[in-house]
Amino acid sequence: MTSHGRKVVRVVARVKPSTDLASTKSISVQKPMGDDSETVTISFGAQFAGSKDSYRLDYCYEENETTGSILTKEIKPLISTVFEGKDANVIAHGARNSGKTHLIQGNERELGLAVLTMSEMLSMAEERGDAIFVSVYEVSQETVYDLLDQEKRVVSVLEGAQGKIQLKGLSQVPVKSLSEFQNLYFGFKKSQKLTSDLPTRSHKGVMIHVTTGNANSGSLGRMNFLDMAGYEDSRKQNSALGPLEIARVNKSIYALQNVMYALNANESHVPYRESKLTRMLKDCLKGSNITLLITCLPREFSQDSFYMLNLASRICLGGNRAITNPTKKKINGLDRSVSLSSAAQRRQTPLTMSAASRKQTVLRGNVTERKTKINTATSAIKARKLFGEANDSVKCKNSSKKVEGKAKMVLKKGISTSKVVLSVQASSPKEEICSSITVTDFQSSLVEEEYSLAFSSSTVAMEPGYSNGASLSSEAIYTTDKETPRKQEEMFAGATHCDDAFVDKAQIVERDENNSVIEEDLTLVIDEGENLDKENNSLLANETASPPLSMRLQELSNNLKSICKFSNQLSVPEKHQTPLTILQAEEASEHSDITAEAAVSIELRTPEKTMPSNIGCSPWKTYSAHSSKLKNSAVGEYLKFINTAGKEDLKKLKGIGDKRAAYIVELREESPFKTLDDLQSIGLSAKQVNGLLKKEIGEIF
């Protein structure tokens, strides 16, 4: 098998010989190098809708080539591997009436592949002094029957501790001559015709065991011949079988196709458990064992045959992909880490002007009120530390998405707003971030994306100026609407984390490694409606005699520390759950000079519904609610333990042995267990999973 020894599954086609020479041939086979071609191309007439131009397989035996040529080129190399201790498989599949049974079994006049192979194996066993035993089985409706037993007993497919498949109840009959094998093989066919009352379709197989002497000695290898049931479209109305039985047969065919593709593509997971047939042949298919998949095609092409040829070509292409990338399975984890690191680098890359402009949000509409603009020169908001290293703005993006939801909710509730335009520009010449956010009236049409804010009525404009990138000056300009009286405004200097809260006015100055000064100004207005003249006079007086810059920076730092430490969680009454709420802050720490009346914060976030202790004023409802919360907590801790514990710790759980623990460790590397239903992938049913969890929780009490 030098030409195709690297492939686990070799996919070939066989065109069924036709006795009617006058019938037209619809299949065309292209062999670039004749009989020595490593791949061939099969095409057919254009009368089949939805078909591709051609299909590529490893080889195709045309109708003028005999069964002996298949034996010489394909089967004999497999026989030598069986006597070397490996398993080999010959599987014939295709549509109905495509010649599968005749190819494998043959008849008394024209021998099939199974009989011809047995003749070769008997002669080799006689030379080597080995013994041969035969098992004949049938798989019908996900049940395995022993055809050499007179009562056709059911064969149990069991899996041992080491993962080895055991076929309990499958008899092995010694065979010393070809006539004995023919009597066994064709004898069960005659008895089957007598006992079958209703038309049934099943998969039939012959398993030839090679042992060193007798059945009790060590087994060398096995040769399997499998005659698959014919594929048939379940939508056909003229079928003698019911649609349920056709669906079951097709399901087992699909399961075998998936296993063949996974083996040929060298995938890490092979779905042996999808059907009883693939689970039964697991030991014969896995590892370095070789499989010959023969796709039988009739001379007169049908839609069912076209579909089976399409599946066979898919399996063949999977083998070519595995040969092209032989180390894919080994470096899968490395590829995953490289992709994660590259994704992290993309997240840490600062936004450029073009990238930020794509994030702009514009809410267009007809505005009837006076338009007011807020121009704020700032950089991207930094996270957590006031004088720390510059961090990326990924966290701010999540907060902005939350703000967008709140703003849209406010607009839907009919809150009249002025048009607000927020322009953000970076202070450093190397960074230019410009995003505009526009909010219109409730009557305007809402259109697009992210960072949209909704503020009520009047606004405040901050215009900071810079001197040599190190000095800071700010001037507050207060504007009011003509229709309303002058409104009171409270200033509160501070800064917040982008995921925690928004403060009325926050000015944060940071020096990065390039000695660039970044100022963050976040302005928001709280309307009170009284004592405006006195407050404005006092504010102007404070501005004329402002303290030194260092003292102001120290005060801002202390304010930020106190806010981050003592900020309260948002609590909203059930009758008035709005996204905009004003919280009176608790008294700050001893480092803060701001009173509780001035510490007013507005937090834009969805209110969390807390679970009251008197749900519906019913003790039973209260108990049920707390029980549900306790159950969810227990399930979460159990899944967390499954995803993080080592193999030895997993074995301490009830019902988890060495094999299941190893399987859990293997599966969670690909994808962690998120729900209890995911534990069914290790071979547990939903009832068994619930039983394991009950045992673990029951030991607490």
Swiss-Prot record:
Keywords: ATP-binding, Microtubule, Motor protein, Nucleotide-binding. This is Kinesin-like protein KIN-10C. It comes from Arabidopsis thaliana. GO terms for molecular function: ATP binding; microtubule binding; microtubule motor activity. SUPFAM superfamilies: P-loop containing nucleoside triphosphate hydrolases (SSF52540), RuvA domain 2-like (SSF47781). It comes from the Eukaryota. Belongs to the TRAFAC class myosin-kinesin ATPase superfamily. Kinesin family. KIN-10 subfamily. The keyword Nucleotide-binding applies. InterPro entries: Kinesin-like_fam, Kinesin_motor_dom, Kinesin_motor_dom_sf, P-loop_NTPase, RuvA_2-like. The lineage of its organism: Eukaryota, Viridiplantae, Streptophyta, Embryophyta, Tracheophyta. Residues 8-318 form the Kinesin motor domain. One of its GO terms (biological process) is microtubule-based movement. It holds the Pfam family Kinesin. ATP binds at G94, A95, R96, N97, S98, G99, K100, T101. The keyword Nucleotide-binding applies. Transmembrane segments: none annotated. Disulfide bonds: none annotated. One of its GO terms (cellular component) is microtubule.
